[in-house]
UniProtKB/Swiss-Prot annotation:
Lineage: Bacteria, Bacillati, Bacillota, Bacilli, Bacillales
Family designation: Belongs to the FAD-dependent glycerol-3-phosphate dehydrogenase family.
Keyword Cytoplasm: yes
UniProt organism field: Staphylococcus aureus (strain bovine RF122 / ET3-1)
Identification of the protein by name: Aerobic glycerol-3-phosphate dehydrogenase
Statement: the UniProt record of this protein carries the keyword Oxidoreductase: yes
A GO MF label: glycerol-3-phosphate dehydrogenase (quinone) activity
Cellular component GO terms, alphabetical: cytoplasm
Enzymatic class: oxidoreductase
Cofactor: FAD
Gene name linked to the record: glpD
Localization per Swiss-Prot or TrEMBL: Cytoplasm
SUPFAM superfamilies given in the database record: FAD-linked reductases, C-terminal domain (SSF54373), FAD/NAD(P)-binding domain (SSF51905)
Length: 557
């Protein structure tokens, strides 16, 4: 129960009383990766997140661990090479949250990609990204392209490229990395905001003053080094330090829409260019839905709640109907949406899509380290870079030595399945185990595929008598209880949006079962009547934002 909601008080007691080699501010994928790398090396690590884990950018991506084909278009060769190699590592270390997905790249007359350039581009991509033989690109004729996805626009179609991307659940990837870090000894807590830094007599950062957002308690965490990994909030965090540099972020917003496959029967993931501005976007089938995105527009409004506007929805509907003209989707067909912010490093005079996705480490005179920019795919390598630097500083300043990075072959939580090649066999073996408990085969397969080597704990929850009084389907009940016991879920939206993904990919379950879920959480976590009211309102607000176009200007008025 290393990351249990029931251990919050125990974790807070340790955070108050101990001194840490490293305190990390930010509980997205970057912070999680740093916590895992540092704790695996033997550092004493603490991590604080002001909202829920992955609530910022790390639950709002296109949900691909991809090699970045579009960066080849911009001649960012190094980015392609590194992300391609990292992608393979991310998959191997957690095949339960990442899965290979063949991607179709249709080529139309006058489109971004011609046959020759696509063949050369994908070939270069294979070589740079170190793509394994079975996943190397294929070039398809017009007939073969339509056989893969008959909905693709036939007019002007010349053929297609076929290559592999990796689909992931970004929020679950984050929580699995976080859980493994906690197993390695990291003290990790959500709903805890860093307010100020503390300094020693030499004006070096030596701690963080925090506030528990659930109880309003204030306390100080003592640290030898502090890393700011706050994503879109890194500038806000740095503003509390006297020694910041002149670098800054430029935020852009990306939006996705979700449509049921009864309306948009997409059978094949497609990467295509839009008619309006030539931007490349994805259409990806998942769990009986198709999701499409993303947009890329400058954003300077409330960081904690970027919203999908009607303009965003219209843009993506137009893009779908342009590339898949027979489906005729309308705004009413959108079941759910999400919007996320990319924390990019400011480059003067560049359009949103032109700004590099590279990451940088900034070191202030105060000793505060900030990691900015970067991509989901590169989280492990980014962590390695900054923890190498932390290790160097701890040796120089304190004479401490730690082992080198060891995350390349380190499975994340749930990833102990005998490697990616064995994953399918592992799942079937767990399905057989579940049959002995009387658990439905399809439910067992979904749970084993999603939770990997942690699935036995969910099967055990299924044996408890409380389930029968819960008014919930077994699958939802065991996921909910597990997420409270093992994944620090405190509010209903933590579960509905981030641990289960239902707010995006099965909003009907949210509408049908939200009241029962809140009842169970109120009972398990001893909510007050005021909390029940507040959290119910938060769920209703999240549903509204997901289902409708919102009137949110790009710049705060």
């Amino acid at each position: 129960m290393a990351l249990s909601t029931f251990k919050r008080e125990h974790i807070k007691k340790n955070l108050r009383n101990d001194e840490y080699d490293l305190v990390i501010i930010g509980g997205g994928i970057t912070g999680a990766g740093i916590a895992l790398d540092a704790s695996e090396r033997g550092m004493k690590v603490a991590l604080v997140e002001m909202q829920d884990f992955a609530q910022g950018t790390s639950s709002r991506s296109t949900k691909l661990v991809h090699g970045g084909l579009r960066y080849l278009k911009q001649f960012q060769i190094g980015v392609v090479a590194e992300t391609g190699k990292e992608r393979a590592i991310v998959y191997e270390n957690g095949p339960h949250v990442t899965t290979p997905e063949w991607m179709l790249l249709p080529m139309h007359k006058g489109g971004t990609f011609g046959k020759f350039s696509t063949s050369i581009g994908l070939g270069m991509y294979d070589r740079l990204a170190g793509v394994k033989k079975s996943e190397r690109k294929k070039m398809l004729s017009k007939k073969e392209t339509l056989a893969k996805e008959p909905l693709v626009k036939k007019e002007g179609l010349k053929g297609g490229g076929y290559y592999v991307e990796y689909r992931t659940d970004d929020a679950r990837l984050t929580i699995e990395v976080m859980k493994r870090a906690a197993e390695k000894g990291a003290e990790i807590i959500n709903y805890t905001k860093s307010e100020h830094f503390t300094y020693d007599k030499n004006q070096q950062v030596n701690g963080v003053k925090v506030i528990d957002k659930l109880t309003n308690e204030n306390y100080t965490i003592k640290a030898k080094k502090v890393v700011n990994a706050a994503g879109p909030w890194v500038d806000d965090v740095r503003s509390g330090d006297y020694a910041r540099n002149n670098k800054k972020l430029r935020l852009t917003k990306g939006v996705h829409v979700v449509i049921d496959q009864s309306k948009f029967p997409l059978g094949q993931a497609v990467y295509f260019d839009t008619e309006k501005d030539g931007r490349m976007i994805f259409a990806i089938p998942r769990e009986g839905k198709a999701y499409v995105g993303t947009t890329d527009t400058f954003y300077d409004n409330i960081k904690s709640s970027p919203l999908t506007t009607q303009e965003d929805r219209d843009y993506l509907i137009d893009a779908i109907n342009y590339m898949f003209p027979s489906v005729n989707v309308t705004d009413e067909d959108i079941e759910s949406t999400w919007a996320g912010i990319r924390p990019l490093i400011y480059e003067e005079g560049k359009d949103p899509s032109e700004i590099s996705r590279k990451d940088e480490i900034w070191e202030g005179k105060s000793g505060l380290l900030t990691i900015a920019g970067g991509k989901l795919t590169g989280y492990r390598h980014m962590a390695q870079d900054i923890v190498d630097l932390v290790s160097k500083r701890l040796k120089k300043d304190y004479g401490l030595t730690f082992s080198p990075c060891n995350t390349k072959g380190l499975a994340i939580s749930g990833g102990d399945v005998g490697g990616s090649k064995n994953f399918d066999a592992f799942v079937e073996q767990k399905v057989d185990v579940a049959k002995g408990f009387g658990i439905d085969e399809d439910v067992a397969r979904r749970l084993a595929s999603k939770y990997g080597s942690n699935v036995d704990e969910l099967f055990n929850i299924a044996q408890t008598s409380q389930y029968h009084d819960s008014k919930l389907p077994l699958e939802i009940y065991v996921e909910l209880v597990y997420s409270i016991q093992q994944e620090m879920v405190y509010k209903p939206n933590d579960f509905l949006v981030r641990r289960s993904g239902k707010m995006y990919f099965n909003i009907k379950d949210v509408l049908d079962y939200k009241d029962s879920i809140i009842d169970i959480m109120a009972d398990m976590l001893d909510y007050s009547p005021a909390q029940i009211e507040a959290y119910t309102e938060e769920v209703e607000q999240a549903i509204k934002e997901a289902q409708h176009g919102n009137n949110q200007p790009a710049v705060k008025e």
